[in-house]
Curated annotation (Swiss-Prot):
EC number: 6.1.1.7
PROSITE patterns hit by this protein: AA_TRNA_LIGASE_II_ALA
Transmembrane segments: none
Chain's gene name: alaS
Domains: entry comment: Consists of three domains; the N-terminal catalytic domain, the editing domain and the C-terminal C-Ala domain. The editing domain removes incorrectly charged amino acids, while the C-Ala domain, along with tRNA(Ala), serves as a bridge to cooperatively bring together the editing and aminoacylation centers thus stimulating deacylation of misacylated tRNAs.
UniProt source species: Maricaulis maris (strain MCS10) (Caulobacter maris)
Name of the protein described by the UniProt record: Alanine--tRNA ligase
Length: 884
């Protein structure tokens, strides 16, 4: 029996033998495609090649592409665990032709592979074609010898693929496997086609047209091929299984889950084990590709998947985090094909453990709320959308988790109501976004790129150089000339100006043309992937395409940027050494004045840890050793120990930057990373490194801000000055400042406690002796009511408790007045709760001070109002309500 990894290798090897470039899987986060949440098909990384926006060296490719379908249009999440073939994560095997071979060779390859390499019986296979595609029908007869009854014409869009309303499109042909009459279901196109007897295993897309509009379609000059075969699906067939979860990979993952949870995958537990195994894959691969759990966008989808798996672990009796314990099993199954699992293992385990601990803290409360909300509901009823949204917003329950919990009760959720509440929150929180309207659309830059090609970057050698003007984009359109005072983006055949990328900001400077024209560069950005657009204004003269100029980036500014960029590499290495190998870069910004570095870590970095990080970085700076740069393939670089950004897509060659000597092993570089930015020549050029801030960015993401060189020195001088000024004010030596401040803080706390006690005695009616004044009687019950100046709402609870204890039986009301506002609290002893409700009494008082409502329990309630001057009126209103 062939294993899943063997089947993957057989597919790729077959096409490699037929002159296809084996392309590694792209990251799950699409590169430069905001229309997609995740890569959900094998062709997605090749989209620009099919549209002609990107030229490939090879016209043939094959890949096993990681895919996720768990959000948006393609959302399989609800079905996962309960069906035979739904997954959130899957691998798509595919072969692609970019204007090279077409239908005949594609069909020939497909038939040879499934019947020859995979050994599937021809009599078990049938195909579909688009009803109007007679060419494909004839080719299947010719190549496979299929009879007409096994070539089914489909006239719907199921067999005609398009990229969108416009663009490349064409008919499809699908290969189906027949499981035999023992399985219910009919062939494709029949009324019972949704049964499980006939399973699609491969889809061949023949891109032969370009859709120009609703009714306008033309032939492509160079037709292309895009095919997709689900690895899990074909593995099940080749292993003689009817359910993907019975294949070797899933059996091994489920066995690991059984071992960790101590529960067999059978009966009611089977679906939960399958959910955990599937979601483990999508969770780990998403994080390995740079996605972090959050409450929005891709991070929210990741958290939804995580929490669904964690809830199923809870159903199986997990009393502590368990998902992180399964990462090693996943690495054993898939780490050879996807080495990012091993590189990210520490991050995956730590994040899963922290997320599950966080979820377990809220799970009980959320499930209790769900039980209360459904207590009076019956089978077939729908939970209110507002309640489902409260579960999401307050307890972190994604909608599908709530739906999953209700499934066993035969209940549903009012999704429209949930979406309405979600939309309202987003509308309330969304900040206004503005755009200048001057930016050129991508189509303009792709057109420019086709004409002029990439910009050669010469800035590694220095900040000056010469270049020929190849493009002018002004007002969002291409131009041939530019006059004085006009703003534009200029492109040259080569430039020393660095275009913003990799977190490093773009260069500024000046461009002087040979005829005397001067262009001031305010920023440099990358357009169309690899063109450097110099953004600014022509301050003198006129220019036209083809003009030659001297380009000079601001050298002092670049030097500061170089120091800060190199410092981010050293800081990254130090963070990993001090905090742990789970630390990975999650973003950065390198400017001339400071650097910002975001990284994965689940708690704040302590002062001692910050000091240790600074000490390591400054030790490497003092080594003053040369920084080395080499170019190599990404695989070779990673094999050599270089750190790569999770989820980043690299080209055929990468720059590998090595800095410093290992603090324990001088033969090993302190930092080795892939980077295309500009850097110092020696570590000593950084001069000094100082962290000035450490904050949280989001759940599991921390940020440090730091300065280097002269900026760091000035910052430290300023901080020392603040310390000296504070020491002078306290009349103490700087060395004793911390001790003196701590003593003052303790003294203040003591005085605050004494003041609070004095206020409490005063509020209870006591004089200097502290003896409290007795209660009055209203409507036959004891009542203590006071207005207390300078007391906030949080301090009233203690006064209420003391008054109730003093009376034994009675009602207490206190109104604190602070900063002109009133805070009210009312307490009722237990024996009187049937006669008086604290909430009703506090509402009466709140109305008198301009407040609305009030909340709490029958025995204790609080409220507030804006008019503290009417506090006595509020107390009178409570007395009146008590009197009835």
């Amino acid at each position: 029996m062939a294993s899943l990894r063997d089947i993957r290798a057989t597919f790729l090897d077959y096409f490699a033998k037929h002159e296809h470039e084996v392309v590694p899987s792209a990251p799950l986060v699409p590169q430069d495609d905001p229309t997609l949440l995740f890569v959900n098909a094998g062709m997605v990384p090749f989209k620009n090649s099919f549209t002609g926006q990107e030229k490939r060296a090879s016209l043939r490719a094959t890949s096993s592409q990681k895919c996720v379908r768990a959000g948006g249009k393609h959302n399989d999440l609800d079905n996962v665990g309960y069906t035979a073939r739904h997954h959130t994560f899957f691998e798509m095997l595919g072969n692609f032709s970019f204007g090279d071979y077409f239908k005949e060779e594609a069909i020939s390859h497909a038939w040879n592979l499934v019947t020859g390499e995979f050994g599937l019986p021809a009599e078990k296979l049938l195909v579909t074609v688009y009803a109007e595609d007679e060419q494909a029908r004839a080719l299947w007869r010719k190549i496979a010898g299929l009879t007409d009854d096994r070539i089914i014409g489909i006239s719907t869009s199921d067999n005609f693929w398009s990229m969108g309303d416009t663009g490349p499109c064409g008919p499809c042909s699908e290969i189906f496997f027949d499981h035999g009459p023992s399985i219910a279901g009919g062939p494709p196109g029949s009324p019972d086609e949704d049964g499980d007897r006939f399973i699609e295993i491969w889809n061949l897309v023949f891109m032969q047209y370009e859709q120009l509009g609703p009714d306008e379609r033309i032939n492509l000059p160079k037709p292309s091929i895009d095919t997709g075969m689900g690895l899990e699906r074909i593995s099940a067939i080749l292993q003689g299984k009817h359910n993907n979860y019975e294949t070797d990979l899933f059996r091994n993952l489920i066995a690991a889950g059984e071992s960790v949870l101590g529960v067999k995958a059978e009966g009611d537990a089977l679906a939960s084990h399958r959910v955990i195994a599937d979601h483990l894959r999508s969770t780990c691969f998403l994080m390995a590709d740079g996605v972090t759990p959050s409450n929005e966008g891709r991070g929210y989808v990741l958290r939804r998947i995580m929490r669904r798996a964690m809830r199923h672990a809870h159903l199986l009796g997990a009393g502590e985090p368990v998902m992180w314990k399964l990462v090693d099993a996943l690495k054993s199954e898939m780490g050879d094909a996807y080495p990012e699992l091993e590189r990210a293992q520490a991050l995956l385990e730590e994040t899963l453990q922290v997320e599950e601990e966080r979820f377990q803290r809220t799970l009980g409360r959320g499930l209790s709320l769900l039980e209360e909300a459904t207590a009076d509901m019956g089978e077939g009823d729908a939970l209110a959308g507002a309640t489902a949204f409260k579960l999401y917003d307050t307890y972190g329950f994604p909608l599908d988790l709530t739906q999953d919990a209700l499934r066993a009760k035969g209940m549903t959720v009012d999704e429209a109501g949930f979406n309405s509440a979600m939309d309202k929150q987003r509308a309330d929180a969304r900040a206004s976004k503005f755009s200048s309207g001057d930016a050129a659309p991508d189509a303009v830059w792709f057109a420019v790129r086709d004409k002029v090609g990439a910009t050669a970057f010469t800035g590694y050698a220095g900040t000056g150089g010469k270049g020929r003007l190849t493009a002018i984009v002004s007002g969002g359109q291409e131009a041939k000339a530019l006059g004085s005072g006009q703003r534009a983006e200029l492109v040259f055949d080569e430039t020393p100006f660095y275009g913003e990328s990799g977190g490093q900001c773009g260069d500024t400077g000046e461009i002087r043309f040979v005829d005397g024209a001067v262009f001031t560069v305010e920023d440099t950005q990358k357009r169309g992937g690899d063109m450097h657009a110099h953004i600014g204004v022509l301050t003198k003269g006129e220019i036209t395409l083809g003009d030659v100029a001297a380009l000079d980036a601001d050298a002092p500014r670049r030097a500061a940027i170089r120091a800060n960029h190199s410092a981010t590499h050293l800081a990254h290495a130090a963070l990993r050494d001090v905090l742990g190998a789970h630390v990975t870069q999650k973003g950065s910004h390198v400017g001339p004045d400071r650097l910002r570095f975001d990284f994965s870590h689940n708690k704040s970095v302590s002062a001692d840890q910050i000091a240790a990080i600074e000490a390591q970085v400054n030790a490497v700076i003092r080594q003053n050793v040369p920084v080395s740069t080499r170019e190599m393939t990404p695989d070779a670089a990673i094999e050599a120990g270089a750190l790569a950004l999770f989820g980043e897509k690299y080209g055929d060659t990468v720059r590998v930057l090595a800095m410093g000597q290992g603090l324990a092993d001088h033969a090993t570089p302190y930092s080795v990373e892939l980077c295309g930015g500009t850097h110092v020549e020696r570590t000593g050029d950084i001069a000094l490194f100082k962290i000035i801030a450490e904050t949280a960015v989001s759940s599991g993401i921390r940020r440090i801000e730091a300065m280097t060189g002269e900026g760091a020195r000035l910052y430290m001088d300023e901080q020392i000055g603040f310390g000296r000024a504070a020491a002078d004010a306290l009349k103490t030596p700087p060395s004793d400042l911390a001790t003196r401040v701590a003593a003052l803080v303790d003294e203040r706390r003591k005085l605050e406690r004494q003041l609070a006690e004095a206020k409490k005695q005063l509020a209870m009616g006591g004089g200097a002796s502290g003896a409290p004044a007795g209660p009055e009687t209203i409507n036959g019950v004891n009542f203590i009511g006071r207005v207390v100046e300078g007391v906030g709402g949080k301090d009233l609870r203690g006064l209420i408790d003391e008054a109730k204890a003093q009376m034994g039986s009675g009602v207490a009301a206190f109104i604190g007045v602070n900063d002109g506002k009133a805070a009210l609290a009312v307490g009722v002893t237990d024996d009187l709760k049937d006669r008086f409700v604290a909430v009703d009494l506090v509402k009466a008082g709140a109305a008198a001070v301009g407040g609305k409502g009030g909340g709490g329990r029958p025995d204790f309630a609080q409220a507030g109002g804006p008019d503290g001057a009417k506090a006595n009126d509020g107390l009178a209103a409570i007395r009146a309500a008590l009197a009835g």
